Amino acid sequence: MAELTALHTLTAQMKREGIRRLLVLSGEEGWCFDHALKLRDALPGDWLWISPQPDAENHCSPSALQTLLGREFRHAVFDARHGFDAAAFAALSGTLKAGSWLVLLLPVWEEWENQPDADSLRWSDCPDPIATPHFVQHLKRVLTANNDAILWRQNQPFTLVHFAPRTDWHPATGTPQPEQQQLLQQLLTMPPGVAAVTAARGRGKSALAGQLISRIAGSAIVTAPAKAATDVLAQFAGEKFRFIAPDALLASDEQADWLVVDEAAAIPAPLLYQLVSRFPRTLLTTTVQGYEGTGRGFLLKFCARFPHLHRFELQQPIRWAQGCPLEKMVSEALVFDDENFTHTPQGNIVISAFEQTLWRSEPETPLKVYQLLSGAHYRTSPLDLRRMMDAPGQHFLQAAGENEIAGALWLVDEGGLSQELSQAVWAGLRRPRGNLVAQSLAAHGSNPLAATLRGRRVSRIAVHPARQREGTGQQLIAGALQYTQDLDYLSVSFGYTGELWRFWQRCGFVLVRMGNHREASSGCYTAMALLPMSDAGKQLAEREHYRLRRDAQALAQWNGEMLPVDPLNDAVLSDDDWLELAGFAFAHRPLLTSLGCLMRLLQTSELALPALRGRLQKNASDAQLCTTLKLSGRKLLLVRQREEAAQALFALDDVRTERLRDRITQWQFFH
């Protein structure tokens, strides 16, 4: 085939130039598969084949692709005929060597946007796959506008355009690149203070951090949201590598000459400030684009707190040439570029709402909103882009300046569960898809019907750093109330800090829940708050806030921190307590969810209750209690604790307990 001969010549040119390209095969399944095999046979290479089904040799499923990160391959096939895993697609592109093709298999071009996407099961909260027309239309726009991508469609003539030659590329040798070497020297001679290195993926920032550790005369501690992501850093640091998780480091009195924080944007600013203040020198690294996270917003906020921050940026790719067509195309397709975040919005701000249909008529606006949200929120990923474009129940507000988006709010519909399902969630018997706050209100609250109420959760909110402290965030929340009707509440779930909570308080939210353990990656407790919009919403917020006040002392005793509520010293078992205790004793409500009412039960009961008292009053560990009570594991310990709660309830009022047990037992028969 003349096409394969031309591709063979182009592949040799790509290898000399140090670049990779995308080749799209769009058509019926058999046609795509046959042409992919012909490409594989014609062009020597590894030909990693990413597909849900093992269709070819060297196969890997999209979900298992993360196990291959850090390895390199020549040529790959990404099968997206039945579903497009955007994060896996981006990750695969990062594993390909210079001179490689990424062959993308797509459905028939004209039928693609109406075809259900199996990947939507991961992010749409729908029981069945849904069509994703907005993402497909966006991807089509990118593919047809990109002259460096090759589009080969069934029943269409294949034309291979001429690509002008580029400068020959010289691959890295393993020693620091000139850009790295210059930055390394600056860091090694840096006076006490804080330095931040930002880079897109594949620029060698982790290697740079490891090289710094290996060359300093003193000691260093590495921290990061996940130790598994520090493998490259550890490789270059050698014997000097020493990792401590953020929460463990904060709780310790460890000291070192340097603190190195890998992917610092993933750590909440309050925790990061505390860590940085303890070390004479700190190096922060963060990704400013890509599926691993975005860090420009973090950097702008951090600069405001540390005006003398030493800022560095690595721009030169290590494993391929600058301006690689594949990297550019993936960045455009998955909206990795957050350069707009560096432009200051000017003029008066106008709040307006928009829906997903704007992706069809005016895609520039939702694209800018997504870029602002991803620039401000580290954990925004390609999954969020797909959810924003096509998942049901998504709503958006923008705060528009004269030239740029100054703020954005993303809301998600929640609740509206049936009475039976809400009761089953409360009892710990069911956990349906989605409904983060609505389910938590039932599963961790006192009202079995809480999830029947209809709410709208704040999924993301962001204001450009240059336009913060002007009340724009509060205007966005007020706008959400204005544009939202026939709902019971707005809700939010966030990592608790005093500063964040003060913002939500100013917006009118009521605190209804605090988590009972810190998140390891953030060092924060999860908080949930409601802004009531109906009488039913107001009653729910008041009931759950009152419960939180009653539980405040027990939670503070457990967490070692006071809650931001006025505690109530009330040891009398209420009607809500009786119902919750029955839910623990006769259903599957968790021990710590029932912490407050169980503590009140222990104060009321005269029984020994060793499994409950040992855990909640004496703070014995599960392992210690299993040994003392001669139990063979945590499951049996929890069974014993439920039995003890039932014994205590029967001893207090057997008739009431019997009635509650019969009522709750009926809820498990929900289907």
Residue ranges, per PLM feature:
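Conserved acetyl-CoA-binding loop-helix of GNAT-fold acetyltransferases
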Residues: A207-Q211, R460-Q482
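Conserved lysine of the Walker
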Residues: C32-F33, K205
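N-terminal pre-P-loop "Q-motif" helix
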Residues: A2-L10, P171-P191
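Terminal substrate-recognition subdomain of acyl/acetyltransferases
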Residues: A248-L250, W258, P270-L271, S277-Y378, ...
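Conserved coupling/interface region of RecA-like P-loop/ASCE motor cores
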Residues: D125-T175, C303-T342
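Conserved beta-hairpin
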Residues: G393-V412, Q419
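N-terminal accessory nucleic-acid engagement/regulatory domains that precede
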Residues: L65-H162
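Conserved RecA-like ASCE P-loop NTPase motor core of nucleic-acid helicases/translocases
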Residues: R20-E28, K38-P52, T198, G218-T230
